[in-house]
Amino acid sequence: MTEPVRIRVESQAPYDVVVGRGLLGELVDMLRDASVVALVHQPSITTTVETVRDELAAAGLDAHRVEVPDAEDGKSLAVAGFCWEVLGKIGLDRDGVVVSFGGGAVTDVAGFVAGTWMRGVRVVHVPTTLLGMVDAAIGGKAGINTDAGKNLVGVFHEPSAVLVDLATLEGLPRNELVAGMAEVVKAGFIADPEILRLVEADPQGALDPAGEVIAELVRRAIQVKADVVASDLRESHLREVLNYGHTLAHAIERRERYRWRHGAAVSVGLVFAAELARLAGRLDDETADRHKKVLDLLGLPTTYDPDALAQLLEGMRVDKKTRSGVLRFVVLDGLAKPGRLEGPDPSLIAAAYSALTGAPEQKSGGSGVLL
């Protein structure tokens, strides 16, 4: 990818996702009309953000850094409250812009803060992790965690632009790059099988942050999300397909007190969802088995604690897709054919979890659909 690629998200307020290398300089042009700019970022990229702040200041913009905790520690009401206080102190009004720098967690909290400050101010996302690029920065969903669960408090607040500078991937720790690949693989299974073919053909290239394979994977995964978001901004039905693998994943994250990387949990969740669909008679063996094979090629986890099902069911009960106590899972009816499985029998869930862990089946508890 030599020239920047612009992917249009045709939502209620259309915007571009610009994908390329060496793009941070474009941010100045995007923000020229901003009264005040708040650069929300995680500690690990302070030097980069300070350089951006200096460039904005040189262009005559009133820009301020707002540092928030890394990863899921940054997605709390206390952190959002801190950000609101800073926005008040720097005088960010309705002509101001919030800019997020970092991974998915920073994107979430910055989007949430922007969406609630003065009932909504502009936000521009500059994701610097693979997960942020292909998932969190696109679509306008923003939320924070509470003791009740992950992302249960949030808003829909679309960005005015997303700037995906692939050069930032070159500074990522390898385990973070690997974790982000789970969302890329998810996009392959729900909509674009070419993603899976590219990974299978060159798994090392898929993890080379400076290579062309990862650039193509990122572009394709972003296009998948842009297409789905354009069809369903508010997650009423179609957009639920983006939660493939996430019902179990969010329960794992909650059980692990958010010490697991989101992508690692999604990887396990994808395998579980495939087993669930296989046992329900909805997914062929080849496609179900392909989940684990592709994820293994990338070094992602594909199993979990065999004794954790009861705790995980508690976490799944508070999943956003659950309705009136009935668990709902996104499953596949074939490659790139996502659907929904509602209220599966507890024995089916237990069997799928057993297939995931390779351990004897546990009793999932309860009966019928009231899991």
UniProtKB/Swiss-Prot annotation:
NAD(+) binds at residues 70-75, 104-108, 128-129, 141, 150. It catalyses: 7-phospho-2-dehydro-3-deoxy-D-arabino-heptonate = 3-dehydroquinate + phosphate. It is found in: Cytoplasm. It comes from the Bacteria. PANTHER family: 3-DEHYDROQUINATE SYNTHASE, 3-DEHYDROQUINATE SYNTHASE, CHLOROPLASTIC. Catalyzes the conversion of 3-deoxy-D-arabino-heptulosonate 7-phosphate (DAHP) to dehydroquinate (DHQ). NCBIfam families: aroB. Belongs to the sugar phosphate cyclases superfamily. Dehydroquinate synthase family. HAMAP family: DHQ_synthase. This is 3-dehydroquinate synthase.
